[in-house]
A protein has these predicted regions:
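A short beta-sheet element
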Residues: 73-113
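Alpha-helical membrane-embedding segments
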Residues: 62, 84-90, 124-129, 168-171
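Generic structural signal for buried aliphatic residues
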Residues: 68-71
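Short, surface-exposed loop/turn microsegments at beta-strand edges and helix-strand junctions
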Residues: 21-29, 48-49, 62-64, 81-93
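Non-catalytic DNA-recognition/assembly elements of restriction-modification systems
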Residues: 1-28, 148-190
Length: 190
């Protein structure tokens, strides 16, 4: 069955960071930035706390919660927010996706958006901007179409997709650590 994204999910654009009004006595929030996105996408293991930006505000802002599906409009990828990155402000380069669990599995949505030929084709067709900075428009995103398999099949595929991403991350991490160890041993031989 073919459906549009807007029929199976709700999309909430991130907060406009420049429009957040700061208040000295407001609760403090950190921002969900590229570093956090890459960690949630199994591409990085390190986040530099030195670069962290904080804001204190009483204003309503869009916060990422553990397990949320978030799409980076700049990277053109979807991730699931980790425990470590929960409670951060999503800026306007991100869109929070609340999938209808009765129709679609969140992990399968990640696979469909990131990896499926159907999702890739639509991302390429709707990307706007120069070759330097490309961006997906939220309204275009809502009109993406998806061919839905059964929920059981979605759960199986989504689980395999997440397991494969995690496995690849740890394999690359082990390879990098092994290379570091070998280079360190070689340096010690001189």
């Amino acid at each position: 069955m073919t459906r549009s994204y807007k029929d199976i999910a709700q999309f909430t654009a991130g907060s406009h960071i420049s429009r957040i009004q700061q208040s000295a006595d407001g609760p403090a929030f950190r921002f969900y930035a590229t570093e956090q996105f890459l960690v949630d996408d199994w591409q990085s293991a390190f986040v530099s706390a030195e670069k962290e930006q904080w804001v204190k505000t009483h204003q309503d802002v869009v916060l990422a919660q553990k397990g949320d599906v978030v799409i980076s409009l700049i990277h053109g990828k979807a991730v699931r927010v980790s425990t470590e990155n929960a409670g951060r402000i999503l800026g306007n380069n991100y869109v929070k996706v609340d999938v209808d669990d009765s129709q679609i599995n969140a992990a399968w949505f990640l696979w469909h958006f990131n990896e499926s030929p159907e999702g890739r084709r639509q991302r390429i067709q709707t990307t706007q901007g120069s070759t330097v900075v490309q961006r997906i428009a939220v309204n275009e995103l809502k009109n993406f179409t998806v061919t839905l398999p059964s929920l059981a099949q979605q759960k199986a595929m989504g689980g395999l997709y997440l397991a494969a991403r995690e496995k690849r991350f740890y394999q690359q991490r082990i390879a990098a650590l092994s290379e570091q160890q070998i280079l360190s041993l070689l340096s010690g031989m001189i």
